[in-house]
């Protein structure tokens, strides 16, 4: 029987930055200030988890956004537009990243429980290595540590490709995909896990897919969020998630269930 020996965590929206607001705010500013195009929160969030330059391309490719661009500039967007917007995105993101490194409630306790079981903690992200030079130390100062980090810069392609997971497995000496759980809060996270053939687990509360700040979430009764949570669960399951958990605190029990299922 192959028990789970490695958990690969996403960063923003899963481990830190409740609601995944650091990149959201930067994307909104870039489209508004750089190109004069207002995009919705939903449009900005939909491609979350991708390498950030790919995220910009994905938003520009949305029919409504593409139509606005063509109406404003009388042409299609091109690589130069993407490069200019990405430069502006980095400026906005780097200015605020340090403020979005607080661990999401339950993460520190859950990671401690996994480590007690001898489980290694790897990580993947849509952030670049330079961005993680801010995020990782900020999170570590608040108690969150991983055993390994892989950024899109280190592999042939970022999410939803499986390469960052595979590199984590090599770095952590985990020989089988059956021994790995990928945990994330975006559709790109789910697909990354599915494409790697590992166990793919989605987290709802605090996620980009839910798109709610911690303050807003705590200001309303839990039952008022059930409809939105149901929508998020359905999207994650449709993307191929093996399990969708309400919070990260449910992860140890989920891993136990996987181990027992494998034994059966």
From Swiss-Prot:
GO cellular component, one term: cytosol
GO molecular function annotations of the record: magnesium ion binding; phosphoglycolate phosphatase activity; phosphonoacetaldehyde hydrolase activity
Known EC number: 3.11.1.1
Cysteine disulfide links: none
Note describing how the cofactor binds: Binds 1 Mg(2+) ion per subunit.
Coiled-coil region: none
Binding site residues for Mg(2+): 10, 12, 185
Assigned keywords, A-Z: Hydrolase, Magnesium, Metal-binding, Schiff base
Catalytic activity line of the entry: phosphonoacetaldehyde + H2O = acetaldehyde + phosphate + H(+)
Catalytic residues of the enzyme: 10, 52
NCBIfam families per record: phosphonatase
HAMAP family: PhnX
UniProt function note: Involved in phosphonate degradation.
Protein name in UniProt: Phosphonoacetaldehyde hydrolase
Origin species: Parabacteroides distasonis (strain ATCC 8503 / DSM 20701 / CIP 104284 / JCM 5825 / NCTC 11152)
